[in-house]
Amino acid sequence: MDYENKILQKYNLCNRCYGRIYAKLMRMGNKDRGTSIKTVIAMNFEEKLKDLIEEKNNLIDIISNSQDINENEEIDENTKNNEDTENKADDKSQSNEEKIQEIDEKINIIKENLTLLRKTGLNGIKNEYIIEELLKDDITREENESEENESNIFLTPEQKCPWCKDVFNIQNLEEIADKIVEALSEYEFDRFLIGTRLPKRIKELEKDLETTFNEKNTESLRNEFGRELGKILTKKLEKPVDKETPDIVVMVNPYNQKIYLQINPIFIKGRYRKTKRGIPQSHWDCRSCRGKGCEKCNFTGKQYPTSVEEIIAEPVMNIAKGSGEALHAAGREDIDVKMLGKGRPFVIEVKEPKVRKMDLLKIMDEINKIEGVEVSDLEYGVKNDVRFFKNEPHTKTYCALVSIVDEELENHDFENDKIVELSEKLENLRIDQRTPHRVSHRRADLVRVRNIYKAWCEPIDEKSFKLTVYCDGGLYIKELISGDEGRTKPSISEILDIPCYCKLLTVMEVHDENNPANY
């Protein structure tokens, strides 16, 4: 505890801020805690002061009595005027005066500390224990030239406090709260959280308290300010503070009343089916103009007229009125690939929505009116759903139409028996697949291990067959078939010893806990 007032000597902290230094001790408000601690310190100083004053008075009495005795004492002619006795008395008197001087120095130090406590907001200290001159602010001649600084004499301890600068003043809190209510009026939300931005000098002060003075029980002003402002806003907004999942985080600088809104996104999850080829999963900028708009893209800035993302997001954004959106899916299919079965799991993230509560069934109906994409199982999700879809391994079932390169038919024996045998050879087969050439511009050049668990091959004619595989997600099926110039090993072309390619590909199922594989 700061019984020597070292902290107050460096920082003239008000009662609230002084209590915040010891915020982790005792369950009470910082202002009450600070007042209580200062009171105990003041009582300790006053007790020492009383003892010193009493000791000083006793010494004064001793000196006074000694002087009276010396004046009335008869000189003994037979003892050479008793010079030795007088010298001893003078020495003793001088010693007592030195002690009084030392006591006065101690008394002055204690009074300086008591004056400092009064100056920083502690009432109840006796006036005789205060050094009046120290109560006045030491304003230099240059400072006096400024009207603003001349008024410093009339500032409260809180306004003078270098830590809080009186930001906890109820008027300041109410003004900030009213600004926040106005800023939030255009947003729909159920829960909120207050965040506090501190100026650099305040952060440095807090760090100094922790390092220089080794105070480990300190609470940052940002925590207390957020707590106090949150109480006022809870009543004004009639909505609760939520530290875990707030819809909106209100960032406040309490020193200049600036407000910043962090509107957290909403997440809507479901599954989509792509029943038409030629639709990419996400928006593609025009290759010629890079999204700026040109004759080739009919000034749309898009390489393709639409995408799965745009079809799903448009009706959502029309209602939510967000600033942007992003589609997160469990993998992706190529533009020329269908996505059938129960559909691919996805999450649509709406950034900074003004409306959070929507009729998802109605939105689902709107999406399903558009040819080529269907959605199902729409419901509200959370941010963790995005991580799950991105990181959780999914197994998948594909169906491919495999064709043999025409010019190679004459040079290779293609028999139906080989196709039937291929099913057995592919089952439980490990595939080492280096990043395909066609995606090497956007994916790291690595060798990835994937597994085929089950395969079914069915001949169609003398140069094509149907291939169905149940395998790990992330296995490039087109390259599994072609071999990609040896980058995928083994490949179907290698096993059959005849060059093959994928003519058509369809994702039949994306398997997860809600859609397990039953093979």
From Swiss-Prot:
Keywords for the protein's UniProt record, in alphabetical order: Isomerase, RNA-binding, tRNA processing
Family, per entry: Belongs to the pseudouridine synthase Pus10 family.
Enzyme active site: 334
PROSITE patterns attached to this UniProt entry: THUMP
Originating species: Methanococcus voltae (strain ATCC BAA-1334 / A3)
Keyword RNA-binding applies: yes
GO BP: any one term: tRNA pseudouridine synthesis
Descriptive protein name: tRNA pseudouridine synthase Pus10
Region Disordered, annotated ranges: 70-98
Enzyme Commission number, as recorded: 5.4.99.25
